[in-house]
Amino acid sequence: MIKVETKTLPAISLGNLDSYIREANSWPMLSSQEEKYLSEKLFYHGDLNAAKTLILSHLRFVIHVSRNYSGYGLLQADLIQEGNIGLMKAVRRFNPKIGVRLVSFAVHWIKSEIHEYVLRNWRIVKVATTKSQRKLFFNLRKTKQRLGWFNDHELELVAQELGVKREDVREMESRMSAQDIALHHVPDNFREEQNFSYTIPYLKDSLSDFANHVEEDNWEAHKTNKLSNALSSLDERSRNIIHARWLDDSDHKMTLREIAHNYGISAERVRQLEKNAMKKLKVAIET
């Protein structure tokens, strides 16, 4: 198995987290063709430069995932670091022949590492520091397993039952259920190689379909770049016609007659120019 060193990644620390995030976001996302090419170089030839590019181009996704676990009292830098470990494991195991984007494959490994980290550290997180908070913590867990998120009426009942303020119940609920967590014991014999055979009961986050969102965003960015390049290949008049007819954000889209008046040509000629321009754009975008 190919080993990807952690020194491949930019260093993270609490003091330079913002600069790390800026650096991670500065790496361009890969098109599906670029990703496939690099993945094949790594998978078939062990190209570590390809591995490095794949990792660096996906650091932003680890940051995105880690933000959904900020409700546990753990440092984001640590969550990101754990997620990066998952990313590296995913990259060195990714088979480009399986027919999915790397982010779809990697998101499970990223979450798995973050979940393990939360599970290891949850017991030392000081969620409840005062007497009333401790009372809430140990009583709310059982109540929430039965009710889930409290509505106003349930909130009032719980506060009365435990003899605390409504605000205290809501605050503890937020601390405990920021991600609707359910913590489970990980078997002592759990090993890294079992990550796919043993399904970790994921801590529910607000982005369970994260990979789909990322792929959609990635595809949208790719299409936008394609469209921009395609438009630049048109002559100025054709480009202006397309913009006025299809890309203008205002409520009023210009008619063929209005454009014809501006250029001193017939509306039929504008229609022909528009049709030809659309054909050129289609060819440029699809190639």
UniProtKB/Swiss-Prot annotation:
Residues annotated to bind DNA: 256-275
Primary site of residence: cytoplasm
GO BP, one annotated term: response to heat
Region of interest (Sigma-70 factor domain-2), ranges: 54-123
Keywords: Cytoplasm, DNA-binding, Sigma factor, Stress response, Transcription, Transcription regulation
Interaction with polymerase core subunit RpoC (motif): residue ranges: 78-81
Family: Belongs to the sigma-70 factor family. RpoH subfamily.
Record-linked PANTHER family: RNA POLYMERASE SIGMA FACTOR RPOH, SIGMA FACTOR RPOH HEAT SHOCK RELATED
Complex and partners: Interacts with the RNA polymerase core enzyme.
Name of protein: RNA polymerase sigma factor RpoH
Lineage, uppermost ranks: Bacteria, Pseudomonadati, Pseudomonadota, Gammaproteobacteria, Enterobacterales
The encoding gene: rpoH
